Structures are given as structure tokens and as C-alpha cells.
Amino acid sequence: RFTFDCPGMMGQRYLYEQVEQVCDDCYNLYREEKIAVNCRENCFLNSWFTVCLQATMREHETPRFDIWRSILKA
């Protein structure tokens, strides 16, 4: 398991775990370490995270994840 600290993570562990689960699920699909790392770059604010949302068939949750990622990046 890879861990990357986000500035807004303190007190938002639940949000972090929800967002991180997308990267974990994406890694489990492809079994490529670079995907797991890239998905978490810049506190999940990157195009890889979007690709992982689509790959895990969760793109309908994009607005919620956008808010959560913004909170974690703050």
C-alpha cells in the first residue's frame, strides 16, 4: 500500500480513504505499480485519477470526488 500525505488530510481521514480506494481498485485492475503511484500524484488531482474513476466504472461519482480531492488538497 502506498501512502501520500495531502495537506488537508488531517481530520479528513474518511475522505482520504474513499479517494484512495479508487486508486487501490484501479491498481487491482491493472496490477501496474505506476498506476497506483500516478493516481495519487498531487493529492489525487491529476488525469490518472480520472482514468481510474472511469476504469472502475465510478465516473458518475466525479462531482463528489472533485469536492473531496479539493478538500484534501487544501
Curated annotation (Swiss-Prot):
Disulfide bonds join 6-43, 23-39, 26-52. One of its GO terms (molecular function) is neuropeptide hormone activity. It comes from the Eukaryota. The modification Alanine amide is found at residue 74. It holds the Pfam family Crust_neurohorm. Keywords: Amidation, Disulfide bond, Hormone, Neuropeptide, Secreted. One of its GO terms (biological process) is circadian rhythm. The keyword Disulfide bond applies. GO terms for cellular component: extracellular region. InterPro entries: Crust_neurhormone_CS (IPR018251), Crust_neurohorm (IPR031098), Crust_neurohorm_sf (IPR035957), Hyperglycemic (IPR001166), Hyperglycemic2 (IPR001262). Signal peptide: none annotated. It is found in: Secreted. Belongs to the arthropod CHH/MIH/GIH/VIH hormone family. Inhibits Y-organs where molting hormone (ecdysteroid) is secreted. A molting cycle is initiated when MIH secretion diminishes or stops. Has little or no hyperglycemic activity. This is Probable molt-inhibiting hormone.
